């Protein structure tokens, strides 16, 4: 009679194990649609704007998930030494457009630049 009890334990825990494995595979197959964005900017926005030649020097600002793409009126007024002091990960220049590789806080930086007076 004891063997029947053990057989019941094995059967029920076996079914529970198979159900857990099935559910975990379903969860693992779901695509991650969330984009992680940070709201903390590791430098002062005013320092970034002044290093770029002031708010009036900005013509157009676009973002990718980790880059800020800025078109400037006067490229010569952009101070690369001041920008490098802000620990920007990368700066790419193409004619009057700069690509700043910053991180996942670029949308917050874009909002603060546009809101700045």
From Swiss-Prot:
Bilayer-spanning residue ranges: 1-21
Subcellular location: Membrane
Membrane topology: Single-pass membrane protein
Any one Gene Ontology cellular component term annotated for this protein: membrane
GO molecular function: protein-N(PI)-phosphohistidine-sugar phosphotransferase activity
Domain called PTS EIIB type-1: residue spans: 42-117
Keyword tRNA-binding: no
UniProt keyword terms in alphabetical order: Membrane, Phosphoprotein, Phosphotransferase system, Transferase, Transmembrane, Transmembrane helix
InterPro entries linked to this entry: Glu_permease_IIB, PTS_IIB_1
Catalytic activity, EC: 2.7.1.-
GO biological process: phosphoenolpyruvate-dependent sugar phosphotransferase system
Domains as described in the record: The EIIB domain is phosphorylated by phospho-EIIA on a cysteinyl or histidyl residue, depending on the transported sugar. Then, it transfers the phosphoryl group to the sugar substrate concomitantly with the sugar uptake processed by the EIIC domain.
Role noted for this protein: The phosphoenolpyruvate-dependent sugar phosphotransferase system (PTS), a major carbohydrate active -transport system, catalyzes the phosphorylation of incoming sugar substrates concomitant with their translocation across the cell membrane.
Name by which UniProt lists this protein: Putative phosphotransferase enzyme IIB component MG129
């Amino acid at each position: 009679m004891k063997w029947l009890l053990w057989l019941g334990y094995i059967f029920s825990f076996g079914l529970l194990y198979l159900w857990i494995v099935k559910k975990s595979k379903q969860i693992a197959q779901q695509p991650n649609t969330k984009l992680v964005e940070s709201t903390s900017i590791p430098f002062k926005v005013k320092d970034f704007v002044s290093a770029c030649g002031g708010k009036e020097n900005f013509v157009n600002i676009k973002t990718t998930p980790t880059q800020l793409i800025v078109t400037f009126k006067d490229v010569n007024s952009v101070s690369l030494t001041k920008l490098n002091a802000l620990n920007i990960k990368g700066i790419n220049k193409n004619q009057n457009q700069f690509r700043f590789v910053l991180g996942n806080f670029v949308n917050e930086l874009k909002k603060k630049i546009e809101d700045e007076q």
